[in-house]
Amino acid sequence: MAALRDAEIQKDVQTYYGQVLKRSADLQTNGCVTTARPVPKHIREALQNVHEEVALRYYGCGLVIPEHLENCWILDLGSGSGRDCYVLSQLVGEKGHVTGIDMTKGQVEVAEKYLDYHMEKYGFQASNVTFIHGYIEKLGEAGIKNESHDIVVSNCVINLVPDKQQVLQEAYRVLKHGGELYFSDVYTSLELPEEIRTHKVLWGECLGGALYWKELAVLAQKIGFCPPRLVTANLITIQNKELERVIGDCRFVSATFRLFKHSKTGPTKRCQVIYNGGITGHEKELMFDANFTFKEGEIVEVDEETAAILKNSRFAQDFLIRPIGEKLPTSGGCSALELKDIITDPFKLAEESDSMKSRCVPDAAGGCCGTKKSC
């Protein structure tokens, strides 16, 4: 019965994204189109180079563009019309490569139509993008090999798949050691009742198949990923009275998380780290997640998990890392040495962000009152 239900959901989602939706404006919630922090200049410029039709058919719920992408091999799960793939392909450069996989044939056809357009737009000798018509929970069937990618991204798609554990398991399989799954998706404040989980429109709107947010950490640990790192979160609003009635007291949030795959070797205690600076678009400051922002040349105390991730990932050359007690060279500036409470709840982060926005009053310099000053 479960297999039959999953197949029915899959068919409904294909119909919704292949035939019902024609543009992002057709969506009935903001669940698939929200973003929660400013977009760096180099990404804005890359977005402007994406063909208009590709951008029009974009249904993602965030901007899944992590940092330090030069020469990386990236896989986009549920690539749709290819918007994120084409942005990423420009950022990884000619020595990098981006593969997009999507189960909706019409979306893949839109994406493939503009391969030459973007290759010429970027001035590349050959296209560094490949699109595959396939299923994100069956990457092996699509020919994607073990440990073949540096980064896996996904933009508001995993919620559309009934077997989320299988999707995460496959992402883990194809990632290299030190690799990262960086993805935006929709999460719920509680376990969803049957009425929501079987509602066709809510499935298509990324709500019916949303994961209870606490379950992500359970699945990540089961598969072997490091604990999820919350990056951004934004509360979802419903613009349809009938859908509001069905949803009732359940709340939804679009959130970006990063999951790292690394060996268990590395620092076993808290460390002090210094960001060397220089990452494209983040030369002076790297907002790693909701809990850690690293400024160039500044000492920051981190927990052992964060230290291990920095040491074993593509960020290894961007940081000086020393166990607490060993002296770090520094160019001066502030020292943020106190570990704060780690935020893991996307609803808490979204509410805090909304509260800060409501209290924010532009000052004469265009900034906000009440914001912390850097020393």
UniProtKB/Swiss-Prot annotation:
| Superkingdom in the source lineage | Eukaryota
* Keyword flag Transferase: yes
Q: Name one GO biological process term.
A: methylation
Keyword Methyltransferase set for record: yes
Record-linked InterPro entries: Arsenite_MeTrfase-like (IPR026669), Methyltranfer_dom (IPR025714), SAM-dependent_MTases_sf (IPR029063)
Cellular component GO terms held in the UniProt record: cytosol
User: Where in the chain are disulfide-linked cysteines found?
Assistant: none
Q: What is a GO molecular function of this protein?
A: arsenite methyltransferase activity
Identify which top EC class this enzyme belongs to: transferase
Where is it located? Cytoplasm, Cytosol
Signal sequence range: none
Give the record's keywords alphabetically: Cytoplasm, Methyltransferase, Phosphoprotein, S-adenosyl-L-methionine, Transferase
Residues bearing Phosphoserine are S335
User: Sorted alphabetically, which Pfam families does this protein's record hold?
Assistant: Methyltransf_31
**Known EC number(s)?**
2.1.1.137
Instruction: Give the catalysed reaction(s), semicolon-separated.
Output: arsenic triglutathione + [thioredoxin]-dithiol + S-adenosyl-L-methionine + 2 H2O = methylarsonous acid + [thioredoxin]-disulfide + 3 glutathione + S-adenosyl-L-homocysteine + H(+); arsenic triglutathione + 2 [thioredoxin]-dithiol + 2 S-adenosyl-L-methionine + H2O = dimethylarsinous acid + 2 [thioredoxin]-disulfide + 3 glutathione + 2 S-adenosyl-L-homocysteine + 2 H(+); arsenic triglutathione + 3 [thioredoxin]-dithiol + 3 S-adenosyl-L-methionine = trimethylarsine + 3 [thioredoxin]-disulfide + 3 glutathione + 3 S-adenosyl-L-homocysteine + 3 H(+)
The protein's role, per its UniProt record:
Catalyzes the transfer of a methyl group from AdoMet to trivalent arsenicals producing methylated and dimethylated arsenicals. It methylates arsenite to form methylarsonate, Me-AsO(3)H(2), which is reduced by methylarsonate reductase to methylarsonite, Me-As(OH)2. Methylarsonite is also a substrate and it is converted into the much less toxic compound dimethylarsinate (cacodylate), Me(2)As(O)-OH.
Record family assignment: Belongs to the methyltransferase superfamily. Arsenite methyltransferase family.
Task: From the Swiss-Prot or TrEMBL record, give the protein name.
Answer: Arsenite methyltransferase
The source organism is Homo sapiens (Human)
Name of the coding gene: AS3MT
